[in-house]
Amino acid sequence: MIMTMIQAINQALTQEMERDDRIIILGQDVGRNGGVFRTTEGLFDRFGPERVMDTPLAESTIVGASIGMTALGLRPVPEIQFMGFIYPAFNQIVSHVARLRNRTRGRFTVPLTIRMPYGAGVKALEHHSESTEALFCQIPGLTVVVPSNPYDAKGLLTASLRSDDPVIFLEPTKLYRAEKQEVPEETYEVPLRRAVVVREGKDLTIIAWGAMIPAARQAAEAAQAEGVGAEIVDLRTLSPMDRETFVASVRKTGRALVVHEAPKTCGLGAEIAATIGESALLSLDAPVLRVTGQDITVPLPKNEGLYYPGPERILRAIRRLMEY
């Protein structure tokens, strides 16, 4: 079936709720309204208010209540309307969600999946366009997942919902309706913690995730016209990171470019660059470069293009790498 990322996410939620009656969805407007982006559309009518719960605008309460649900054997799926609204819940996530399994020596698990849209590219204001995934990657005990297409969105979400450990599931708003793709109607999993090479190349490696994958593809096609073969690695799971896949690619190509829309300073690109330096230094023909968002608050919509990494900036970085 051809579907958008929103439809793929909705189908994954529907199928898993049918399969496992312990799955509970909760969040602001997820019930009767079907979610701010309609990712939960139809679920309230199908499963009822006891399994699709509208909550107040209180992120700490949404996540805190979800922790309590896991103690009762449920598998909650809290939705936060935008990544920029998650910060009131950080104490719950850092102090409890990520630690309970270790704190109880495995007697309790926290099988919850926190879903939230993230990222710029849709002309939205600051709290609605943030990309602070590196904050979650700094917290041991969390799995951080970002799909870049409808097929992966369904499979990764299915795998997340079946995980006994907590997952931060980040959904790029720019890609919600940007692309339609063939997605199997039957249920399936895309493995967590596994990166994938989505484009083969011999001259350099681009490492990216989420909405930066389509941008990297556009830049790679333009570079191909100039005789440069760019390989693209889609991380898919940001933490724990599949370092082996991108290190193997860099050892083959000899050049590396990391692309993310989060600000540059202390972004995940720095960790990836350090990993390459530690594991593939002698294979490098050029320094590792980064194309990222600017180190500023997300600007007003008319200036978004100055902040947001696009194919043109990626192509310029490719050309610079090939000068070495």
Q: Residue locations for each model-derived region?
A:
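Thiamine diphosphate
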Residues: M1-P166, L170, T173-Y324
